[in-house]
Amino acid sequence: MSNNSSTSFKNQKPVEPIGIIPRSIIRTFNRFIIQLFPNSNALVIQEFRISRYQVFVSIQCLLSLIFIPLIITFLSKTFVFLPLTEYVWNTQTDDIFLNSYLEKEALSELQDFEEQLYFDYFVSPNTYETPNWASYQISTDSSSQLESSFNNFPEILKSEIQKKTLELATHYNQKSIESLTNLFSDFVSFGTFALLVIILKPQIIILKSFLIESIYSLSDTIKSFLLILGTDLLVGFHSPRGWELFLEFVLNRFGFPHDENFIFLFVATLPVLLDTVFKYWIFRYLNKISPSTVATYHAMLE
């Protein structure tokens, strides 16, 4: 008896096909029919076990897809890529900057520091020896001006500039190493995620079914609210600034140059493409699956 029950449980599919009619309605109707039969208690228990198994597998799959790539990325970055990159970068190359953008950024920061020293030097004459006011020119955009003004500095200010230069060199050398390390570790993270998608394909099908069923169980108002919230965050009026910050974060993470033309082009085109995809999805699929949600969505927009 128990063997037949376990065999029947294993043969039962935890994923139901998706049709035009929401599965919540079909499931409610099936439960009503099942309760009309004498052995309805056993079937209800079996259905409960299937639902519990579906929830357990979905949570396990979701946590695996999130935390396994993060853990592997952290371990590979800390114990493999970072020491290896530091060794190769500091011993096999003479470069400090990964690209010219980081070099210009360091030079600009050094010039700002020099101008701050000029300001402090002029407003606090008692702190340093009396300056020769006619010999000072604030450097703005030239390394030669920086060098000539450096020669006019007192020794204490020269030491401050030298100290700041060493700090910037160390900082940007480490930043170049971290940029390369982030590139390698993120590539490993992406590969790990793709491998998990292939290995956990049955569990992902169950997870997808669980998420769709959970969304279907929501009311039309809540579904419309979530739809408006998602579209406004991605393609709304204030979304370009968010996309700009996201792109700057990606460029800083990998040490890529900040090309303003590329950033403006990205911000101007991607929200438009996403808005077109959302509208097509609402018209093509959501209008067939849940017309009431589409009606509520348009009513809330108006």
Curated annotation (Swiss-Prot):
Contributes to K(+)/H(+) antiport activity by supporting proton efflux to control proton extrusion and homeostasis in chloroplasts in a light-dependent manner to modulate photosynthesis. Prevents excessive induction of non-photochemical quenching (NPQ) under continuous-light conditions. Indirectly promotes efficient inorganic carbon uptake into chloroplasts. This is Potassium/proton antiporter CemA. One of its GO terms (cellular component) is chloroplast inner membrane. Keywords: Antiport, Chloroplast, Hydrogen ion transport, Ion transport, Membrane, Plastid, Plastid inner membrane, Potassium, Potassium transport, Transmembrane, Transmembrane helix, Transport. The keyword Nucleotide-binding does not apply. The keyword Plastid applies. Belongs to the CemA family. The lineage of its organism: Eukaryota, Viridiplantae, Chlorophyta, Ulvophyceae, OUU clade. It is found in: Plastid, Chloroplast inner membrane. InterPro entries: CemA.
